[in-house]
């Protein structure tokens, strides 16, 4: 009888635990591995970024192409060290952001010279690379993995090799520095006058805030989100327009 009473008393707590567990997205972006490996440090990618990407995000694809073997070494490292469920959230985010950016660069190099990533047939939809045992497309990494991790600042970290995209950082994202890197990226993008024109009563902003508006409205409006980073305080009733997106190559 005491055992039954004890179990009944536990039911609310068990129900709550199950509810919390169900509210957490399944880690489709990480695997279970009995021989769990440590998160990689992305140093190989960092060295290449320092060499071929300026502080303003311009990419020397011509020079990068001469170092494609070094890039492939890093891509092989990514393929052999997919995220583990034992990794921290920041380590997993850093992995997928770097993977997206590195494979975007590889895609451009494979088709270089060109004027725009849109000159490539279905650049985001085709499954062009393998990580672990699974084939991925850039689209899948962005929409099925990164966006599902409920971190809107990823939109300022992943780069689509185009002028209107957030600048490609010349630093690799890392587990230890991720928070400060994402904050710096968000602030830089919002206040970049080539991406957004902001005044108190009127804003002309990147189409990113239109395409992914839901990602930025989880705790308020898009204007509320912008005001977290904007150097100019935007009035809540400000007129909103969106800039034409420039898909020219970011070289």
Q: What annotation goes with each model-predicted range?
A:
Residues 20-97, 101-251:
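Interaction/scaffold regions that mediate signaling and macromolecular assembly across diverse proteins
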Residues 1-27:
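Bacterial Sec-dependent N-terminal signal peptides
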């Amino acid at each position: 009888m005491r055992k039954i009473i004890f179990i009944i008393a536990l039911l609310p707590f068990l129900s709550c635990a199950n509810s919390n567990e169900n509210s957490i997205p399944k880690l489709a972006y990480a695997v279970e591995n009995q021989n769990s490996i440590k998160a990689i440090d992305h140093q190989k990618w960092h060295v290449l970024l320092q060499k071929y990407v300026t502080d303003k995000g311009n990419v020397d694809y011509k020079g990068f192409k001469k170092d494609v073997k070094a890039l492939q070494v890093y891509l092989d490292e990514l393929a052999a060290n997919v995220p583990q469920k034992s990794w921290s959230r920041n380590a997993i985010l850093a992995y997928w952001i770097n993977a997206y950016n590195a494979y975007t660069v590889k895609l451009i190099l494979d088709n270089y010279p060109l004027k725009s990533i849109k000159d490539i047939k279905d650049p985001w939809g085709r499954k062009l690379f393998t990580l672990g045992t699974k084939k991925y497309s850039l689209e899948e990494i962005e929409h099925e993995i990164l966006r599902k991790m409920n971190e809107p600042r990823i939109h300022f970290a992943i780069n689509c090799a185009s002028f209107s995209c957030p600048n490609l950082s010349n630093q690799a994202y890392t587990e230890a520095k991720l928070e400060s890197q994402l904050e710096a990226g968000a602030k830089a993008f919002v206040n970049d006058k080539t991406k957004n024109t902001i005044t108190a009563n009127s804003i002309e902003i990147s189409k990113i805030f239109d395409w992914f508006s839901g990602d930025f409205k989880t705790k308020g409006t898009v204007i509320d989100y912008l005001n977290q980073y904007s150097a100019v305080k935007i009035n809540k009733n400000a007129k909103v327009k969106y800039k034409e997106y420039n898909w020219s190559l970011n070289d």
